[in-house]
Regions:
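Sec-dependent N-terminal signal peptides
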Residues: 4-13
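Short coil/turn motif common to extracellular beta-sandwich-like domains
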Residues: 265-272
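Sec/Tat signal peptide C-region and signal peptidase I cleavage site
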Residues: 15-19
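N-terminal nucleophile
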Residues: 20-248
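Residue-level detector of functionally pivotal "anchor" positions at catalytic/ligand-binding pockets or at interdomain
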Residues: 246-263, 333
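Short proline/glycine-enriched turn/loop motifs at strand-loop junctions of beta-rich domains
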Residues: 275-280
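C-terminal tail/sorting-segment detector
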Residues: 291-294, 301, 305, 310-333
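Beta-strand signatures of extracellular beta-sandwich domains
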Residues: 281-285
């Protein structure tokens, strides 16, 4: 969730928590550096005004990672999770810290469910999850190298199995795979309390941050906070997503298949970047999402000699306001 909204909830909703039935995924893309978050819940903005629905569980730190805090959601736990990620803790360390420092103390952590993903200092993906014994059944999580899928008060384990299978089988961008994951739970009663409504959930969202995005201005940020009774939030979100994809700038004419070429990679001291548009700009971002280098590019080969520390960077190539491509660069001065 955007940091400003999260801080507002700390003031407005301090002490409030809900046993919301929720299924969700957090994931990273090691090629593009994108970080994604998607989910749905039988909590919506009508039941809990100001929550904006399921999206309340989501917090993305562009260039670093994403955190979902669900089941007896508590604003302080979510804010603390963000702070721990900003301090550099790994997903496993963040969850261990939250268990030891729950906002309500004692054994309150047994009611919580968390999913966390990030990039380590070398750009490798990491994931972790926690499903406390106090979460309501059916509850559980699924972990992969670059994703965490979790849910509670579900129809059964088949919901998470389907979500994971759809995510792994999907092709395309990270956002395409997140939507496929949600569609894996698009059955009446996926969140069991919504069975009487004939829907999987009451609210749904999908979000993706590219390297360099601001917390409050993500590349993709779609939300269905509530709907009339009987309408399926995942279907509504899919329509919003399909419409959003149509608004993306079309590829430059005659260069649809001409992906920029960066070599050598890993690079030491210099690298070449070949582009197929007349002019573009290169921006390099570190894993904290900070811009560390920028240079104009011209059609053909461009030799680049950035003065940056060793590490993993994401090269963002754009023409004007249009993003052309994002590449991963391993830099070894």
């Amino acid at each position: 969730m955007k940091q400003t909204i999260l801080l507002s909830f700390l003031i407005f909703m301090s002490g409030q928590f809900w046993a919301q039935d929720t299924f969700s995924i957090v994931a990273v893309d090691t090629i593009t550096g994108e970080i994604g978050s998607a989910g749905a819940s039988c909590l919506d903005n009508i039941q809990f005004p100001g929550s904006n629905g399921a999206i309340i569980i989501s917090d993305i730190l562009p260039g670093r990672g994403a955190i979902h805090t669900q089941s007896y959601w508590h604003a302080t736990n979510q804010a603390n999770a963000r702070l721990r990620m900003e301090e550099g803790m790994s997903p496993d360390q963040i969850i261990a810290w939250l268990k030891a420092n729950d906002a309500q103390g004692g054994f309150a952590w047994v009611n919580r469910q968390y999913g966390v993903v990030d990039f380590d200092a070398q750009g490798h993906p990491r994931s972790a999850a926690l499903t406390g014994n106090g979460c309501l059944d059916w509850k559980g999580h699924r972990l992969g190298t670059n994703y965490a899928i979790q849910g509670n008060i579900l129809l059964g384990p088949q919901i998470l199995d389907s979500m994971e299978a759809r995510f792994l089988a999907a092709t395309g961008s990270l956002s395409d795979r997140l939507m496929a994951c949600l569609q894996g739970a698009n059955v009446p009663g996926a969140d069991s309390r919504c069975l009487q409504n004939g829907t999987s959930s009451l609210s749904a969202f999908v979000r993706v941050a590219k390297p360099g995005d601001a917390d409050d201005n993500l590349w993709l940020d779609l939300n269905v906070p509530s709907l009339p009774a009987g309408m399926e939030p995942i279907d509504s979100l899919q329509r919003l997503y399909d419409q959003w994809k149509m608004t993306l700038n079309s590829p430059v004419p005659h260069t649809q298949n001409m992906t920029p070429v960066l070599a050598p990679n890993p690079a030491s001291g210099w690298f070449m970047l070949q582009i197929f548009t007349e002019q573009a700009q290169l921006e390099l971002f570190d894993l904290a999402g900070r811009q560390v280098f920028r240079q104009e590019l011209w059609k053909g080969d461009n030799k680049l000699i950035p003065s940056i520390p060793a590490g993993v960077y994401f090269a963002r190539i754009q023409s004007g306001q249009k993003l052309l491509h994002t590449l991963r660069l391993i830099w070894q001065p």
